[in-house]
């Protein structure tokens, strides 16, 4: 296992789905950053199931607790430990089906890698619930990068094959609260909701694409040749369970363009060098170029479905089938939005510190 | 800058396009691995321009030199330094157009990040030539993971929009040497070659998609939650200039499937647990599951084109236009194949060491 | 701040002296290690003030809590979070003298480095209490290295200038529980206790030397050229507040010997290569040589004394004097023994994993 | 093996004593630092044997070569690779005695750890010659920290038991060039030279103590709780072969002082907070306090002596004896001075970058 991420803004994740808690330690946060517990709670609530229709109906009362690193509402320079307690855990279903490895989940690989000692309840360490820790860390990162003006906003760009129209930045901010699936194209949003309803009734699940945008990035974030802005973001985002693809700007589409179309011409805008298009997604040579950062993330359909699936019984080493009971998100894409945002904030915070753009003490 | 990659199998890259050399130090290679200089040379030759038609016609006589870490044809446990000298460098064109930042290149971001001190000749540290170092390191990694049976093969899956038929593993090995563009679908290969010819005549360039496959991986490679197999591979592959997207298995396509179609059912094959499909690309929960690893890589069209492009003159801060002279690859996708293979080998070597699957001393 | 230590066995420390808690996350512990909460509690109790005479009389009721990473009494491969709550904290004295920087403490450097945002209560992050976290992590490390037979024992070798006779290993284990100062030379122990009594009455404090011994180390721990066994141990041990010197084997004494006396001759003992003396402290070329590891640690006298000291008032920037009230250890050397042991166990665990000597799954 | 050191100013060492070369890659050097090859050469020459009497008489013609990272005499932000070629190597003596492990050397531990594959010629990777790479990196670090006014000076404080009088800083700079053993106390220097002569005639060797001083350090270098200034320096210095002890300020002597004597009182000097004594060696809480840094390093006597020593024959696994022929330094302490200085510069450069005190681009 390797549960730390980042070089100067470094997060260390701990906890399990059905253990005592999910938590994170954030090291390297500059001293003097004003932090209010509610600012972190808001981000965690965004991710929370039950916040909106059509995700897990069980109610998670996720109150965050600050254990260290914040004193008189300012960061101290010391590591910040944040925890959410797990409550009302019922592991009986996992005990019942324990020997049957769930397709699309980490039951098999986890069992093999950890010699059967891994906590299998609720997926244990592989559960999407672990990302609550990422989101807490992301809230601190978001606050930190806001001191240099960076804003990070994400949305559901595609769900079950339904594609949202490309939104303007202000539409994302305005419309997203009106959508049950975090999609600013409200017409598409309605279709997505209907499709989730239908898939849920069929006992099946859906995937989609999250797009995340970073605004007001300075030129210079990214540490080539290995710690590129793309590479660091991709690594962080692949830590979100169910992510199977990451692309920047025109991405896979760029591979079908000619150079004359794909190259973003430079020109001078308000005395600054900008590009007139943004196929590169705000990144050239692995370094932010001052244009908006664009990253798109492919999320596979939720592997937990109630339809019967062929699988193997680990105890008897025989073929069998499995029906997963209980309530699971039909589509996690809307919830993944806040996690993709969090990972983006975390990486930008780390790279801004590494580039020397954010100082070691924040002076308000 | 950050020029080291990997935790136990760690490579450190150095050199510039028009400097003295391109080199790499590889630390953490177990002692006792038999290494012949020719094995490394073969990989470098694969990447070399001029090896096949339609890539850069200039001839690079890239003889690798071993500076350290290998004694009596075996690794010693000490760091291995490998170097290729740069020869017959002509930087006059770069001097001529120095103040005009090339669209699609790192000229602008490099200038800004390094305060104008960066070596701009031939793209300096951002040049594709730097990947010759990655390929040397990849050759060592390839030899190391072959001791546990892993094989890594890549090919051109798509070029300028032309898609190769999905090949069988043996076809990749057999056909690729007959293709000028590293495409085992020889019919598609012919079309790709013709398209390159045409784009070259038009002064334009093409992109494409590289697919890379890992065979015979043990179950257990990948260190979640942050150092997942996907995340580590993606980060390494984004260190290749021009890569704008990475996906695993069904990738972005998976986001449009239902769970019942995307989940790979388990069954028992020859007393081993395998899946009957491989939409997950051989990775579950960030850990290899024993099925073939599948990664697909989007490569943007070469940014160096001879068509005129709008850009900015850094010295005068005025809008201008640029025509890039000299000979450049119309499409780097065929050459990128060996680099994607190299990065894959490097990551697998690191993760196999981290999983304790490769010992610290190799005993033949 | 940098609060993580280790490469494969990695600990991340958090918490403050007068905050909610002191805690540690331990990542990289192999799955399958049997862990009982009492085993960790025993180590924490050893460090605890009040356990023996002449250290801080205040009673710390330090019950450890396991938050993650242990399931059914075995490690799971997931990160282990351990916490001790801070109770009955009275920060009034620190509030009273806040502006007067305490000589010998980190008040001044902490204030300067963190822009005055650091938690000054009880020394905050610089307090010796933070080492309770190190000791919890050390307990896990101790259990892990015991699986390959390694034993780590420490003792007070010198206190206030009184030197203990060099003990036999079995005497350390037997006598130490009879000494109030963790000194196996019981005659010297009595003198040390008397000296502490005297210094306490005078409002002054004492320092000393801790010796720590590692038994049954395999040959091969240490990763030169930079991560030597000496270097890794020294770095870890200097994380203990008040440590000002570290030496191995004959140490500074070796610098006054001739080579013919200092070199440890090899010979064959029970079919194994051993040295007939151990001036090198069990380390050659930065790597364990199979002989007992010997490290000696200089601990400065407790900086908190009740005698009046000249200092500066930060608010007024004027010279002033300070008398520190409250109860403080007259000598922390006896308590430092368990912390030095803990750091030694942590480093040996990390290096044993790095050398591939401890597997990724422990099979009992 | 682990051959990289540092987090932001990161050096990677390679090469062997009797291989092609000794080299180093330095990553993370800010762009815009003026570097002249002669500045590096001067430092390497200081370390060079033959530069002064009584060290190895063989003449090393160590001309450094810059392979990358410097363009038009300024650093570019790219990794800097520096190399010294090994010339006139005669390995015959090592071939002759190969099976006899040399007491006090790493022959035994190296053989065991690397399964016999290690390059044994001249000690291979464990040779003191490797420190030539450290010194090259140290020259770059020295130049970098000079941009914020830091000066690092070292000297022979003790040799074979002869102790130099504590020098004033200006005496170190002035007198050291007049001493054949880098000792500014010229009377002691004469005695040391005579003692070396005598030990050489007896076929024996001597050790000693190097003191290194850092002047004009800003307050704030050091990243507790684990990456303390003491810990980072100690780790780096223990990478020098033959070092067996490291202490700061009063060091082991502090352990025998009372708190009232050891605490350094604060007062205001020229509007700045300073201490009136410096028992802490310029470090409080693991962070520089603005006073001179004092570190003392115990160097064991050279293990290579011409007197006969009992040892073991690895091939036959029998007891035997060994006489080491050839010319070896009777005492390496004078040469170690420049290496201790180099390691100190390297650590200070890294910590100054980590503290945000040195910017990412140097503007002259």
Curated annotation (Swiss-Prot), chains A, B, C, D:
Cofactor: FMNH2
Top-rank lineage group of the source organism: Bacteria
This protein's name: Chorismate synthase
Gene3D superfamilies with a match to the protein in the record: Chorismate synthase AroC
GO cellular component, one term: cytosol
Residues given in the record as NADP(+) binding sites: 47
Assigned keywords, A-Z: Amino-acid biosynthesis, Aromatic amino acid biosynthesis, FAD, Flavoprotein, FMN, Lyase, NADP
Gene Ontology biological process terms, A to Z: amino acid biosynthetic process; aromatic amino acid family biosynthetic process; chorismate biosynthetic process
Record InterPro entries: Chorismate_synth, Chorismate_synth_AroC_sf, Chorismate_synthase_CS
Catalysed reactions, as listed in the record: 5-O-(1-carboxyvinyl)-3-phosphoshikimate = chorismate + phosphate
Subunit structure: Homotetramer.
Pathway: Metabolic intermediate biosynthesis; chorismate biosynthesis; chorismate from D-erythrose 4-phosphate and phosphoenolpyruvate: step 7/7
CDD domains, sorted: Chorismate_synthase
Assigned EC number: 4.2.3.5
Residues the entry annotates as binding FMN: 125-127, 285, 300-304, 327
SUPFAM superfamilies cross-referenced by the UniProt entry: Chorismate synthase, AroC
């Amino acid at each position: 296992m390797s549960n730390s991420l980042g070089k100067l803004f470094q997060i260390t994740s701990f906890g399990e789905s059905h253990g005592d808690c999910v938590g994170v330690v954030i090291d390297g946060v500059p001293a003097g950053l004003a932090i209010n517990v509610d600012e972190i709670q808001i981000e965690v609530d965004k991710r929370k199931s039950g916040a909106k229709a059509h995700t897990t109906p069980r109610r998670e009362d996720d109150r965050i607790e600050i254990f260290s690193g914040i004193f008189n509402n300012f960061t101290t320079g010391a590591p910040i430990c944040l925890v959410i307690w797990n409550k009302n855990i019922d592991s009986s279903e996992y005990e019942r089906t324990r020997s049957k490895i769930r397709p699309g989940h980490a039951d098999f690989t986890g069992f093999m890698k950890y010699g059967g000692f891994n906590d299998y309840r609720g997926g244990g360490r592989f559960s999407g619930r672990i990302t609550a820790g990422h989101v807490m860390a992301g809230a601190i990162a978001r606050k930190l990068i806001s001191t240099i003006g960076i804003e990070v906003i994400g949305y559901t760009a595609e769900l079950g094959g339904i594609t949202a129209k490309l939104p303007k930045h202000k539409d994302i901010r305005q419309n997203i609260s009106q959508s049950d699936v975090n999609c600013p194209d409200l017409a598409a949003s309605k279709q997505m909701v209907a499709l989730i309803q239908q898939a849920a009734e069929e006992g099946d699940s859906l995937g989609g694409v999250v797009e995340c945008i970073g605004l007001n990035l300075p030129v210079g974030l990214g540490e080539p040749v290995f710690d590129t802005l793309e590479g660091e973001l991709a690594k962080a985002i692949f830590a979100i369970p169910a992510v199977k693809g990451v692309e920047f700007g025109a991405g896979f589409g760029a591979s079908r363009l000619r150079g004359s179309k794909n190259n973003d011409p430079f020109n001078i805008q308000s005395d600054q060098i900008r590009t007139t298009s943004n196929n590169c997604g705000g990144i050239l040579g692995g370094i932010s170029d001052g244009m908006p950062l664009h990253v798109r993330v492919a999320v596979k359909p939720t592997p937990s479905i109630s339809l019967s699936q062929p699988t193997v019984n680990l105890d008897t080493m025989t073929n069998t089938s499995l029906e997963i009971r209980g309530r699971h998100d039909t589509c996690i894409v809307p919830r993944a939005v806040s996690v993709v945002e969090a990972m983006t904030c975390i990486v930008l915070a780390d790279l801004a510190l590494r580039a020397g753009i954010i100082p070691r003490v924040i002076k308000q």
